[in-house]
Swiss-Prot record:
It is found in: Cytoplasm. Mg(2+) binds at D8, E57. Belongs to the P-Pant transferase superfamily. AcpS family. InterPro entries: 4-PPantetheinyl_Trfase_dom (IPR008278), 4-PPantetheinyl_Trfase_dom_sf (IPR037143), ACPS (IPR002582), Ppantetheine-prot_Trfase_dom (IPR004568). It catalyses: apo-[ACP] + CoA = holo-[ACP] + adenosine 3',5'-bisphosphate + H(+). This is Holo-[acyl-carrier-protein] synthase. It comes from Koribacter versatilis (strain Ellin345). Pfam families: ACPS (PF01648).
């Protein structure tokens, strides 16, 4: 059964501006070390960062918290299965909230271009 859904769209140039202006401080506040390593290893790193930003926002919507109740950006981590399929992993307070809702699985879909990144998360029991 679907317990929650979330979707978000991000303007890639906005993320590029934040990275340019705040550098490692921005990256470290939003992304986990593994996410930073992955994105920086790709030619289109800014698009990848934007897609992960959108995924984290979508996940916040799927569990219904936003950035309230002790939930942080690092509570949501985008990974990849060996075949390339994106995954959403909940940590800390976000994991507690998702489990409290009965959530056992999060489905993530992301897409990005030079201008936009979009992500959708479905929380399922």
């Amino acid at each position: 059964m679907i317990l929650g859904t979330g979707i978000d769209i991000v303007e890639v140039p906005r993320i590029a501006q934040s990275i340019q202006r705040f550098g490692d401080r921005f990256l470290g506040r939003i992304y986990t070390p593994a996410e930073i390593r992955y994105c920086q290893s790709k030619a289109n790193a800014v698009e990848r960062f934007a897609a992960r930003f959108a995924a984290k926002e979508a996940a916040m919507k799927a569990i219904g918290t936003g950035m309230r109740g002790g939930v942080t950006w690092h509570d949501f981590e985008v990974g990849r299965e060996p075949g390339g399929r994106p995954t959403m992993v909940f940590h800390g307070k976000a994991a507690q909230v998702a489990q409290g809702l009965g959530g056992r699985r999060a489905h993530l879909s992301v897409s990005h271009t030079e201008q936009y990144a979009v992500a959708s998360v479905i929380l399922e029991d």
